Amino acid sequence: MEMNGLGQIGILYPQFKKSEKWLQQALESLEEELDRQIYPDGFQYELTTNYHDVVINNYQRFIEVAYKFGKTIPDTLLEKLSRACELDIKLMMPDGKTPDLNDGCRRDVKGSYEVRKRIIPNDKRAKWITEGDETGKPEYTSAAMPWSGFAALRTGWGQDDTWALMDAAPFGRAHQHEDKLSVLLYTNGKFLLTEGGNYAYDESEMRNYVLSTRSHNTVRVDGQDQNRRKTYAWKEEDIKKKANLEWNFSEKWDYAKSAYDEGYGEDQDKAPVHERAIYFIAIKISRF
């Protein structure tokens, strides 16, 4: 956010002697932050669909101003930003929205790309999602995110397709829920498996509920929730670590597997290993 502001000041106020320096500093920092905050598979390190798009929006606002004033954006920055944008497509549900992950929300992917296609020239995914250009349709159907730890399973890209998501993610940088191995399932225009969603950032009973394991489709142990929050500390090198996610995708079926072994209960003293695997039929079934 700060570099978005600094970059725009450097562009909009050329009468200041340091305006060009401010612009260059912003460009350098913005590209560095993509390396620092974005996993190699494209997800921002808070692992929430809402704040992921907040980050993209800050780049978007800066780049739009830069283009209007004839400034050049480095190709390397645009390539990294494009990868972050495509993450929304990898996660996208049949209704065209992102799932509500951690302190996230369900955002319309096509609407987001209507703006993004103006800032990333020749983005083939943007042309597909906004204009229906089949040349930009993903060559994949299901998608695994090896670093951020999600597996999005789907029978196709249509509104009547079936979609599932397995959360095998690390705890993330912020806005986390205690939800590892949670599963979402959506078919025929509705959720069959959902979760507690989000709530105001307060200390209410409802806020505690949506953060907890019991508001997600994963197990508790002896009535106790997962508790990674107690001892978790983000390290800069975590952005390069792969999640403990296994997967195999084929034309007829998909498979995803992970495990949770980081403790349950207030003191993390309940320490069984919970393993979960999903077998997903990857062909359409009209009635079941």
Language model features by range: what are they?
Residues Y39, F43-L192, E246-E251:
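Carbohydrate-active enzyme catalytic cores, enriched for enzymes
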Residues L34-Y39, R276-I278:
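Blade-edge beta-strand/turn elements of extracellular beta-propeller
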Residues F16-S19:
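Helix-rich, typically C-terminal accessory recognition domains appended to large enzymatic cores
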Residues G7, I11-P14, Y67:
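Short coil/turn linking the two alpha-helices of tandem helical-hairpin repeats
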Residues M1-N4:
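Extended ligand-binding groove/face enriched in aromatic
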Residues Y140-F288:
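Non-catalytic C-terminal accessory modules of carbohydrate-active enzymes
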Residues Q24-R36:
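Short, charged, amphipathic alpha-helices and their helix-cap/turn boundaries
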